[in-house]
């Protein structure tokens, strides 16, 4: 972009003449920080919501998927972007409404997410027939439906809080797989998933995503990939590296892999089909309720 001016340098307490490099928006910088600068890789940035981002060497137009945007990360490639409005926020909702007081009494609040993983791990894949629709704040992809609502169905007297939590983990994973299926239908096939954000701390949640999607998941040494991606932009901008792919090869390090467990494929496939059907079965009811309330789910 240029160099830091004397006035800006004075305001910031820096030296005039420092190179100023243009970066990018947070999610796109995360793609760079995860080394998702090659076809068939998908970046999954998991926080309160989840962004799903990929690069294609040709434009792909897919209903419910944002883009294609040419040149936003690499000049000769197109970004495809999907997303879920509620993922980590649903887990936080469960924590705040079902567990907060109990864990405060035990003085274990700082470890509550580890405890939640242990709780959910007690339940078998498929949550004994319990399903969660993750549209707690509407559906971003692939339906673009702000009137959609969340749902918990299949409850019986044998189900517990742990079942509901496990079903939330699985329901959000079904939502991610729905986006992957939408992309695949229109010509983009993800072969690897790279994750960042607070949600990447839950190995159980990531394992469920890998099992449902039947795709390996990779973790990197830097949890906040957007920050690393911005540093990579700067490194290329000042000439340390000749290109973004060259820089990511040197600066992004893989810290772990999570591979799909094939024994869970059939059971998750069955419940995924019910997940997709549930939206269409409930769509009119969700819209009527949202319209009657006169509001869309809070963002």
Model-predicted segments: where are they?
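Active-site core segments that coordinate phosphate-bearing ligands/cofactors
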Residues: 2-299
């Amino acid at each position: 972009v240029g160099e830091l001016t004397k006035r800006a340098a004075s305001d910031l307490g820096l030296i005039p003449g420092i190179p100023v490099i243009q970066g990018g928006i947070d999610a796109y910088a995360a793609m760079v920080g995860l080394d998702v600068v090659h076809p068939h890789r998908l970046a999954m940035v998991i926080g309160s919501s989840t962004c799903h981002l990929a690069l294609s060497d040709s434009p792909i137009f897919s209903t419910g998927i944002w883009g294609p945007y040419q040149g936003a990360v690499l000049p000769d490639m197109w970004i495809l972007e999907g997303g879920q409005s509620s993922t980590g926020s649903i887990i936080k909702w469960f924590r705040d409404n079902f567990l907060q007081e109990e864990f405060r009494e035990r003085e274990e609040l700082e470890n509550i997410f580890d405890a939640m993983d242990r709780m959910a791990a007690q339940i078998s894949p498929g949550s004994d027939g319990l399903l969660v629709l993750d549209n707690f704040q509407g559906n971003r992809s692939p339906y673009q439906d702000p009137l959609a609502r969340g749902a918990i169905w299949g409850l019986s007297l044998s189900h517990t809080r742990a079942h509901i939590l496990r079903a939330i983990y699985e329901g959000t994973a079904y939502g991610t797989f729905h986006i992957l299926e939408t992309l695949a239908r229109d010509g983009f096939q993800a072969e690897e998933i790279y994750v960042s954000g607070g949600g990447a701390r839950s190995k159980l949640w990531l394992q469920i995503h890998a099992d449902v999607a039947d795709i390996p998941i990779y973790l990197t040494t830097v949890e906040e990939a957007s920050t690393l991606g911005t540093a990579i932009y700067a490194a290329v901008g000042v000439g340390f590296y000749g290109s973004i792919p060259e820089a990511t090869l040197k600066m992004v390090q893989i810290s772990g892999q999570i591979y799909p467990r094939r024994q869970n494929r059939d059971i998750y496939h069955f419940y995924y089909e019910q997940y997709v059907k549930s939206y269409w079965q409930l769509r009119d009811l969700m819209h009527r309720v949202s319209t009657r309330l006169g509001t869309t789910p809070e963002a």
